[in-house]
């Protein structure tokens, strides 16, 4: 088996980095642009494989989408402009694509079959199947957990619902809201904990109306959306890898440019500051929720991460676990059972990967207990088809002084950060 040899024993990281566009916002710009009326233009779109799956799905649904002058141009014809696809919609590795597009297609008068790759086919879709069924959609997957492939027959006469989310999931909330835009009457979604709110913000940006009152979101449908010009900020989930690298590799100083800092996504910044990180915000634009972040090597101490903080840093927990292996004392991550149904069981995979390199991590049902600081050593590792595990391992390898680190299935990183290794080499040489 051919494995990629990762860079080890890195000196200080120096330089400036512009991380790729935010994945969550890129998906939603394409989805809302496809059903808005008029020409939507998107600058700074992430061209990772997940977002390309969303774009291809809408092309198969009859939407004209093309690239012009470094922008994505979407010719939306409104909700009525979608047409029945001639083929199965393949969502690749993207849970966001499958769940949000299922919600959107709930109100369409045709049937579709949605499939995914091996990893996506192991991710439960019961969380969207149940609320969409309540709205009058015929939708089903495999077994009780409703694993893909999904078969969906839309309904032009969707029923509004009031739905309390059993789990904290922005994807489930978004699927219901996208369906609610096509339902006649008042739909309410009640969250357990506040999750990322890009869907609510962007529905309003596209001229839609909804009311957010704490954990309750109210939307009266049906509504039409109007095309917009969207600029996608850098993805804080991608910036997180460089943030952590800068904090744990002695002598490092990095400037992360144009990072999106929507408050529902900035949990990692609060955590690292509590742990003692030296970070400075430059050129902060509060209205656009964008800033540059200067990070320097810091001595860190362990912390507790739990409760309402978890949905605000759920995707950053693998790299936070690595950070904790280099902090003084114990870091405890709780209430994060959602990690077990991501692209992989991230609790188990993070624990196994970092422990194989010498870390001291105990997996729990809903998180991890991490003792630090520990020296990391060479090991044979894999992404297990999970982009965030791959990038976490590549950053961990930089700390290794003894032995080699080999990584299997590194192509998974293309999902969200196609230029990751190129950027890594540049920061090691600047």
From Swiss-Prot:
It holds the Pfam family EPSP_synthase. Keywords: Amino-acid biosynthesis, Aromatic amino acid biosynthesis, Cytoplasm, Transferase. InterPro entries: Enolpyruvate_Tfrase_dom (IPR001986), Enolpyruvate_Tfrase_sf (IPR036968), EPSP_synthase (IPR006264), EPSP_synthase_CS (IPR023193), RNA3'P_cycl/enolpyr_Trfase_a/b (IPR013792). GO terms for molecular function: 3-phosphoshikimate 1-carboxyvinyltransferase activity. Catalyzes the transfer of the enolpyruvyl moiety of phosphoenolpyruvate (PEP) to the 5-hydroxyl of shikimate-3-phosphate (S3P) to produce enolpyruvyl shikimate-3-phosphate and inorganic phosphate. Belongs to the EPSP synthase family. NCBIfam families: aroA (TIGR01356). This is 3-phosphoshikimate 1-carboxyvinyltransferase. It comes from Streptococcus pyogenes serotype M5 (strain Manfredo). The gene is aroA.
